[in-house]
């Protein structure tokens, strides 16, 4: 009787055994599943790079870009994992490439013409599917690019020489406006004013307040750089991005007023040929329905900010190098005397200024301003044996490539690096291919014009032991001097041009 009473309990215990085993095995099975998931994530890509680690890897890599800046983070990861490696930005797989053959492949093919960046960030600065610089709508970009190419080549390039020379001379005559009580010249401000004035005369032709707009351009650039790869959560907290939004609005409102003045000028012109330029072509395209008002305003904004944003800093670095290397300055001046003499530079002189060109190239190689290019793959591909999926982000680390391959003295500033013709696959300061810089030819000519005109009139000096290496820099979207800190002081000493050039 007693044993019979125990039987149900015995049966119940027997039934409970598999349930107990199943429950106790669950944590083990979960751990095994997670390990399998991690293993799959780690082994799914043959491209070197940090591990996925349950999503922690993407968070850390994106955080590093936000903390260090895009350019500095790219150099860090290429140094850590090699010249073709993979990280994540905003959770998206991103390749960082500093290998010339891979870079050549990306620049060459049309399925890499799209850019990448935060959609919210690009919308905030007006570049999302608009303008030319970061327009990631290939169809609209193809519609807009010909307007830039027409303005930046051919007759526009020829006219630029005379316009730029006059602008430089006028600003040098007013050098006191950018010189402090100690005699130091604010070269960055001087160059930004010259670049803006020249761009305005060539592409818009409406009187403007240079000082006010230069400051607004700096605010716009800071917003662009700050917002480009910010995560979406950043834009859910309005007080975090409000100051950037204001900076963008300040410049866009200013440009809108200038464009309206241009529209009025075009509408009331007695002779239309007197006001034909880049802005006029865009306004006519809007009237035909090819572009919107927003397209026109953004294109003009980007045309006006391009030179003050990058070329002014490039020229600032070049003048520091001239001051640091007197033997290079002597070679440049000798060539100026031989080719140009005591007259203003002309378009015919440009191709004969070989030493000046080598100096410009070596300066851009040794101390670049724009040292990376951001692209997105529009279709599946294979680059140097590595599979690349459609939608993959790509950063071309051009500045690092210029220090790794081909050049005999890659870590030194010397014109010897350009004594021989450099194959263009190894030197790409402006990029090439279907999405290469539209302004690369006019930029080279403009830099020659500025250097020749300025160096014939002034000798550039810095304080002893102050040089380009001493400048605090920020390597983010581009490499700029940190203007929040004290920059290297530069003195412009007038010289007897004829006597000096003949030495």
UniProtKB/Swiss-Prot annotation:
EC numbers: 1.14.14.14
Listed transmembrane segments: 21-41
Catalytic activities: testosterone + 3 reduced [NADPH--hemoprotein reductase] + 3 O2 = 17beta-estradiol + formate + 3 oxidized [NADPH--hemoprotein reductase] + 4 H2O + 4 H(+); androst-4-ene-3,17-dione + 3 reduced [NADPH--hemoprotein reductase] + 3 O2 = estrone + formate + 3 oxidized [NADPH--hemoprotein reductase] + 4 H2O + 4 H(+); androst-4-ene-3,17-dione + reduced [NADPH--hemoprotein reductase] + O2 = 19-hydroxyandrost-4-ene-3,17-dione + oxidized [NADPH--hemoprotein reductase] + H2O + H(+); 19-hydroxyandrost-4-ene-3,17-dione + reduced [NADPH--hemoprotein reductase] + O2 = 19-oxo-androst-4-ene-3,17-dione + oxidized [NADPH--hemoprotein reductase] + 2 H2O + H(+)
Residues binding substrate, per UniProt: 309, 374
Pathways per UniProt: Steroid hormone biosynthesis
Keywords: Endoplasmic reticulum, Heme, Iron, Lipid metabolism, Membrane, Metal-binding, Microsome, Monooxygenase, Oxidoreductase, Transmembrane, Transmembrane helix
Keyword Nucleotide-binding found: no
GO cellular component entries: endoplasmic reticulum membrane
Pfam families referenced in this protein's UniProt entry, alphabetically: p450 (PF00067)
Reported cofactor(s): heme
Gene Ontology BP term (one): uterus development
List of residues binding heme: 437
Membrane topology: Single-pass membrane protein
Compartmental location: Endoplasmic reticulum membrane; Microsome membrane
GO-annotated molecular function: aromatase activity; estrogen 2-hydroxylase activity; heme binding; iron ion binding; oxidoreductase activity, acting on paired donors, with incorporation or reduction of molecular oxygen, reduced flavin or flavoprotein as one donor, and incorporation of one atom of oxygen
Record's function text: A cytochrome P450 monooxygenase that catalyzes the conversion of C19 androgens, androst-4-ene-3,17-dione (androstenedione) and testosterone to the C18 estrogens, estrone and estradiol, respectively. Catalyzes three successive oxidations of C19 androgens: two conventional oxidations at C19 yielding 19-hydroxy and 19-oxo/19-aldehyde derivatives, followed by a third oxidative aromatization step that involves C1-beta hydrogen abstraction combined with cleavage of the C10-C19 bond to yield a phenolic A ring and formic acid.
Cross-referenced PANTHER family: AROMATASE, CYTOCHROME P450 FAMILY 4
Recorded family membership: Belongs to the cytochrome P450 family.
Protein's name according to its UniProt entry: Aromatase
Species, as recorded: Mus musculus (Mouse)
